Amino acid sequence: RSLVGSEMCIRDRVGAQKAGSITGCSSSATVKGTVDVGGVAGEKWGSMTACYATGNVTLEIDSPKNLSGGGLVGFNGGSSVLACYATGNVTSTGSSTGNVHIGGFLGDNYTTVTACYWKNNHEQGIGYNNKVTEATKVDGTDVTWQKAVDAMNTALQTAGSKWRYELNGALPTLRKL
């Protein structure tokens, strides 16, 4: 099943995406959870294109399990992430005897990430990374939001996507061609 800019996706977040694609999705929700927690999706196995999250994310640790938290996605397995960004702060509370991976963009990553950006309280964009990625921190000096928008739009155009970012305020927003 694919979510393409639907009301459900814009108002809420995806708990676990097992297949399909999420495209043209945004979330400003404050998200709290206990296992895999992210601004748009807690766990993602399908593709994600042209999505962003601006709300804060909190991983509430109270488990011996392996846990992950990220500004966009907590656990990123499966298919690709293309032209997405996250700006909400990512924090954690508690402790675990398992592995805990937290990143400003993704908690755990096992797939290709292209032309993606983050700007929040984390220097590290990906908590645990098992792939070559293009996830870059917007620092306002060398990497600005305008440079990020240009790179994300180039990647979207190359992929044949009808989505584009615009920078008319402090943060980029999406529009469909």
Model-derived features with residue positions:
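Predominantly extracellular beta-rich ligand-binding scaffolds that present long acidic/polar faces
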Residues: S6, R11-L177
